[in-house]
Amino acid sequence: MRTYDLEIFAHDYLVGIYDGQKYIQYWNEDIDKIKADYEEHKNDIWCGHNSGSYDSILFKLILLGNTPEKIKEYSDDIINGRNGRDIIRKNKLQKIPLYDWDILLDKVMYSLKEAEGFLGLEICETEVDFNLDRKLTKEERELTEKYNRHDLYATWQEMLEQKESIKIRMALIAEYNLPKSMISATNQKVTGEILEGQYSDFKDKQEPYDPSIAPVEINNPEYHKALEMFTDCDQLDYKKKLKIDIAGVEHTIAIGGLHGARTKYHYEGEIWDVDVGSYYPNMMINFNLCSRAMKNPENFPKIVAKRLAIKKKVNTYLAEGRGDELTAVEKAMPYGLKLVVNTVSGAMKAKFSKLYDERNNNWMCITGQLLLIDLIEKLEPYMTLIQSNTDGIFIIPHDKEACDREIKRWEDKTGLILEKTVGKKIFQKDVNNYVFEREDGGVTPRGAYVAQRYNDEHGLFQCRRNLDILDVGIVDYLLYNKDPHETIYGTDWLLWKFQMVKKIGGMYKACAYEVDGKIIPTPNRCNRVFAAKNKEKYGKVKKMKNGKETWDNVESLPEHCWINNNDIRGVHVSDVIDDIDLEWYENEIKRKICDFTLETSERTKGKNYSLEEDWRRVQVKLGREI
């Protein structure tokens, strides 16, 4: 595998390649070498950041012999919003094989500069203006080469984090005899090929729900309104939402799913997390809701059965110490088929997918929430409901035998399996943000406040890697009563846990920050920011909008900021103790815990706002010592 990255100028272009050992860089004068390199490595996998939408297109145009001026024209078109598919069709680029793995494929969009920040690398932006209307000087070329090598290395680090995903994709290609070009396809496209989907345009997209397809039994008239919302209509209304009280918890009912939770809630004692195993896939099978666009609808249940069989085989071989007897494809297949199975439901809602079947996707989502309401209704006399989400519920069981009996009846009726995880603590801000401690001591953190708690244990690179230390402090206080002061000062943390990677958007032309009372422009549009201890020297980070000459503050940052765009891998807080304001992070943890646990009516406000008083109220509410 190799990473590649292009730098495009008005009268020059640079093609950079890195294979993990050496950098290869070609300028436009080296077109023959570029073509020769491509011929030698055209069967390799080429990895790039956003390469599917940019680099792969321009690289193929270079191979066709386009001039630097023409390449720049195409580059500007793409940057300004032209659809790359149009360029591909017009120039017949699909005829040039390039096995491109786009790092951003099926991922949340983020820039390479943000990735460099998340990874702890130096955040390096070009010193050479891409819009220079002349040939580059020797010095400018050297600066561009240096910048290009930096980006290639950063992309290589990203690729290493996706190595298993690449192996899984190659295993699926081998198992189903797909063309190698499918390495560049989305998960939905690969899934559509494996399941032999056929592009379809069903006319019944918003057809009212047919309650006869599933054994839904809802007796409570109030709860029954959820069923009526989807049946008593001429067509399904995607914008309509229904709010009803179910088991003492306000729920929102909509096409996409069921959501309800006790807000700012905590409980210590026996808790059950009751989830439906593989909810959507099993509903598709049990209630005949597979995509009607599949040539052979029986393919989907076969895939599900195949995954269970290969998963069992792999686990058995590994447990017996016979892992070396498994092929690489077999080892990857449980994960590959899980990806296929879990991709289908989303593909059914995607208009240009071969599995597109909007009606069955709607009915599947509706069936799922109605069956959960059915389950809650039957359990209600024997439990307290904590929350409901798309595929499961959290409950406090008061009569465990009765709860188990109703769960078994529901399973027998639906043919679905409920997986019960017993826990001992839950702290819940709302349906999207909670911390659940399991009976075995394991922790499930969900939502923007706490999801980064275990980033360092789940791989180096995460798409969202800002202020990890806050997530650590919130979870450790809620579950273990660890004071935020101890969290911050009791460990010599790696510095990246305190970083805020901030990138200004395209509507802004410049970035700066306050130093000694002066606004100092920064060369970077993306910066790694920390709370600054020296409050007299450092101030806000600023941005300037296109067409204006005044500075605005960059949002969600401290009053006093210190920018460090250097490589901070291996750097500890103790190394910068004179620069970083640890008290700010401690107070931010407290502020977020207040937000997590206190209702608006329970907090101080306006002129009377006091973090100290809010923090005291948190401790009282949670029964902690003051």
PLM region descriptions:
Residues 1-16, 23:
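Entry/capping segment at the start of metal-dependent catalytic domains
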Residues 1-8, 100-102, 272-274:
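Two-metal-ion RNase H-like nuclease active-site motif
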Residues 7, 118-126, 132-282, 362, ...:
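Conserved "right-hand" nucleotidyltransferase catalytic core of DNA-directed polymerases
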Residues 15, 53-65, 277-291:
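Short active-site loop/helix that positions an aromatic residue
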Residues 21-114, 147:
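Conserved DEDDh/DEDDy metal-dependent 3′-5′ exonuclease domain
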Residues 48, 116, 151, 155, ...:
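A residue-level signal for conserved active-site and pocket-lining positions in enzyme catalytic cores
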Residues 98, 107-112, 122, 127-139, ...:
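Helical catalytic core of nucleic-acid polymerases
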Residues 334, 401-626:
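C-terminal, non-catalytic extensions of nucleic-acid polymerases
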